[in-house]
Amino acid sequence: MTEKGKHQLDAFIALLESNDREGAVAFALGLLERGDMTIPELYEEILAPSLNRIKVPRETEDELIWREHLQSAIVQAVMGACWPFLLLQRQKYGMPGRNTRVLLVAPEEEYHEIGIRMGMDFFVLLGYQVDYIGCNTPRDTMLNAVKTLKPDLVCISVTNYLNLAQLPAIIAAVKANKPAPRVFIAGSALARTGKNALDFGADGALTSFESIREIREVKQ
C-alpha cells in the first residue's frame, strides 16, 4: 500500500472509531468522485482492511462485539451509497459477465454478510446477472433457488470455518442439477484450513475482484 493509501485507510478508520456514519459515507464517495479510487480499490484497500483489523477476543465479546456490529453497519451504508458509481464504472471493465447468471449465498448458521455483499457488487461491476440471497440460508432453500433460477455459477460464502463441514454435501447437491452450475467458495474460512476449494468439491475459490475477473466460460 502506498503512503497515500495508508493515510486514506487511517482516515477512514478514524471515522469508524468515532461512529461517524455520515462522515464515512462522504469520505468514501469523495474518493470515487475525485477518481482517487475505483470501486474494487475502495472495497479491498479501505473497507475490507478497516473491518479486518477488528479483533474481538472471546473473553471480551460482551464488551466489544457491539462495536464490530456498529462499524460493520457503517461500512454497509458506505457500500449502499456507492451503487451509482458502481453502475457508472461497469463499462470500464467490458461487461465480461453479460448473459451469465450467478447466485450468491451463505449457508445456514453463516451470519457474516459484508464479504458476500462485496462479491455481489464485483459481479455486478463485471456485468453478471446477479441473484443475491444473502446469509444464513437453509440448505433446502438454497437448492430450491438453484433449481428455480438455474444460475450458471453459484458462489457460496463462508467466514466461520465451522460452517465448512456442511459444504461438501451442499456442493454435491447443487451440482446434481442438470445442467450443473459451476460452484465457487468465497469467504475467509478456507484460508484457515490448509485446504483448497477442490477438497470440498468446488470448482475454485474467489478471494478478490481479480479472481472474479479471471472466471472463464462466460456466455457471449
Q: What is each residue range found by the language model?
A:
Residues 1-95:
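Long amphipathic alpha-helical segments
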Residues 100-102:
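Conserved hydrophobic helix-helix packing surfaces used for dimerization/oligomerization
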Residues 108, 113-114, 133-140, 165-166:
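A general structural motif
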Residues 117-131:
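Short helix-loop-beta junction
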Residues 124-125, 137-194:
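Cofactor-cradling patches in redox/metallo enzymes
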Residues 129, 150-152, 200-203:
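Glycine-enriched alpha-helix->loop->beta-strand junction motifs that scaffold or abut catalytic
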